[in-house]
Amino acid sequence: MRRRKAPVREIMADPIYNSKVITKFVNAIMLDGKKSVAEKILYGAIANLDARGEEKGFDLFERAIENVKPLLEVRSRRVGGATYQVPVEVRAVRRQTLALRWLIDASRKRNERTMVERLANELFEAANERGASFKKKEDVHRMAEANKAFAHYRW
């Protein structure tokens, strides 16, 4: 374990939407340091959402992330030779990180042609409380609910 906590690095808000969440999302999508490709994918997906007309793309994006953020998760805890799945609350930073990760993973597993389409459709579905990423959150919550009996092992 490290001696002291690593300082949290300040990240710059993105130039178009002036949002730190967008910057984090771009960094999470990025593969092999290709940031411009990652930006093209995300901005393309938001433009795709804009084109659907009902609501602004950025608002759908924010709602999708909010809908996928988990409140509880289970962590393994060994007590006297048995391993228990103990439900714990998720801290705000991890909540956001998990939501971004789940959205990206679900998008990559979809079978539309381009990543822009996949991400746009996954964001749209998550904003409307459907889709694989939202299901992942529901599954995590269900696991926490099922293991509520072990909540007293929290640390």
Swiss-Prot record:
Molecular function (Gene Ontology), one example: rRNA binding
Top-rank lineage group of the source organism: Bacteria
GO terms (BP aspect): translation
Signal peptide annotation: none
Pfam families hit by this protein: Ribosomal_S7
Subunit structure: Part of the 30S ribosomal subunit. Contacts proteins S9 and S11.
One GO term describing the cellular component: small ribosomal subunit
PANTHER family on file: RIBOSOMAL PROTEIN S7
Gene3D superfamilies reported in the protein's UniProt record: Ribosomal protein S7 domain
Name used for this protein in its record: Small ribosomal subunit protein uS7
Main function: One of the primary rRNA binding proteins, it binds directly to 16S rRNA where it nucleates assembly of the head domain of the 30S subunit. Is located at the subunit interface close to the decoding center, probably blocks exit of the E-site tRNA.
Organism: Aliarcobacter butzleri (strain RM4018) (Arcobacter butzleri)
Keywords: Ribonucleoprotein, Ribosomal protein, RNA-binding, rRNA-binding, tRNA-binding
